[in-house]
């Protein structure tokens, strides 16, 4: 069989002799994970499959169901049940009319439990919204997650149970939705002469932060999921029961952005490699330490004589640093 090989030398915008290697942060929490948002690679973590109440970061499930419902411009009339939700609120009033889209902004920026109630009531009119959440979890293979309500409140000691791995996987999935990305990256949002400031402090103070969701209940303690992107390298971090969570997230991002880079081979969807058109079901690439690379590092794409892509390789001189067969 004839093999066609295309190779591309990489051009790096960092200096190999000056790579920063700040120490890995000291992390005190029940569970955490650092995940590549594109490839779902796990770069670091502790107790990533530990099941815990996750509080309001589970609202990202409520949000993605709202955004995928096809009903984002539907107007919802606020009912008494919505206004009586405890905890975080966007202070909806009985009889208010507000769109699903605006409710989702209130849900993600201000963690409004009243917004969660109104969204779930409108989308799943028979009060089976938690069932819909669990069906979506099953679809996404979130095998350690159980959702009991749209808000994340520990109602009757039954909150939303998940893991740092499942939440990072869910958030990475949500980032594929452009509207979700736009909402979580919004620092301030105004509606009816009311301004909502995003509770995600990292978005306001860390230049590479692209979004996130905060959470807290007495049972779950502090929970946080965030994302940050530098050049083509986007990470998702989840911490559960972490007191100094915003600083920990920032320190982890700085560590990985300083010491690692992402090398992309294929994006999910249509790719153009020279004169070849390649369709990929997944993002394909790798996260690698910068000190393993130099100016003799290059990418190889191996094709058969029918122009089917067989393998992606990363090489340094003649050494194969990484390879991925497309039938894997």
What are these regions (language model features)?
Residues 15, 38, 217:
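Anionic group-transfer/hydrolysis microenvironments
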Residues 2, 20-23, 39-41, 71-72, ...:
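N-terminal secretory signal sequences
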Residues 1-4, 100:
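Structural motif marking the loop-to-transmembrane transition
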Residues 3-12:
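Sec-dependent N-terminal signal peptides
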Residues 158-328:
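Domain-terminus/edge residues, biased toward the C-terminal soluble/receptor-binding domains
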